[in-house]
């Protein structure tokens, strides 16, 4: 880690913070049973991630800030709408309408006015309405939570930054089936595309809206 840190420091990566904007949205990535139920081969224990995300979502609800929940769903009979992703991750072909694996975990505090977006690829922005909805709502900040840190969270953060949003990742509100990948990607995201923040700091920001 020290060698990597030195290289990034010399390149001035992560030197500055993007900071918080005036109006945020919380984007909760893929807390569906295919990811949160340990009986599924792709599932892992994300109890703490769900609990910490719920705390943020509850504050967002109180303040009237928009909350989006994304999930991976394939409508084509053989999951052709996944493209080549099923070549690398074949089990996601099971994630179809009516399957338990596409349902958002019941422990999540989904509000009546929240927005549920179905997606077919890793990023919550790719071929979804997310960007246009954020723009119409006047959002300049995206708070990304959910799973997995190394894949769908990562892709969502990358795209949020590319679309010009101040991108915040509460460090205990994201998770991964691999602790090693989780830590590595959080470290890298904080240096390149987002502010990885203590959840308390994000809660304080939301309460101040």
Predicted regions and their residues:
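Active-site-proximal loop->helix
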Residues: 177-190
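Internal catalytic-core helix/loop-beta-alpha segment
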Residues: 98-146
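Glycine-centered short loops/turns at secondary-structure junctions
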Residues: 62-65, 138, 164
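Short glycine/serine/threonine-rich phosphate/pyrophosphate-binding segments
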Residues: 149-156
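A charged, well-structured terminal subsegment
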Residues: 193-209
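Active-site acidic carboxylates
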Residues: 1-112, 206-209
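A short glycine-rich beta-strand->turn/loop micro-motif centered on a GG-aromatic cluster
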Residues: 143-146, 164-179
């Amino acid at each position: 880690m020290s060698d990597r840190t030195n290289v990034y420091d010399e390149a001035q990566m992560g030197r500055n913070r993007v900071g918080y904007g005036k109006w945020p949205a919380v984007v909760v990535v893929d807390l569906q049973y295919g990811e949160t139920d340990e009986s599924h081969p792709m599932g892992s224990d994300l109890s703490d991630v769900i609990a910490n995300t719920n705390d943020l979502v509850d504050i967002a609800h109180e303040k009237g800030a928009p909350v989006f929940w994304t999930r991976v769903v394939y409508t084509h009979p053989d999951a052709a709408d996944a493209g080549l992703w099923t070549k690398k991750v074949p089990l996601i072909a099971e994630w179809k309408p009516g399957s338990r694996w596409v349902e958002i975990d019941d422990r999540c505090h989904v509000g009546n006015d929240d927005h549920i977006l179905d997606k077919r690829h890793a990023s919550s922005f790719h071929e979804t309405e997310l960007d246009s909805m954020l723009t119409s709502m006047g959002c300049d900040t995206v708070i990304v939570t959910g799973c997995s840190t190394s894949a769908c969270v990562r892709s969502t953060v990358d795209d949020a930054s590319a679309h010009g949003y101040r991108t915040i990742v509460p460090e205990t509100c994201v998770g991964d089936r691999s602790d090693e990948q989780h830590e590595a990607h959080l470290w890298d995201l904080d240096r390149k595309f987002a502010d990885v923040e203590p959840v308390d700091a994000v809660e304080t920001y939301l309460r101040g809206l």
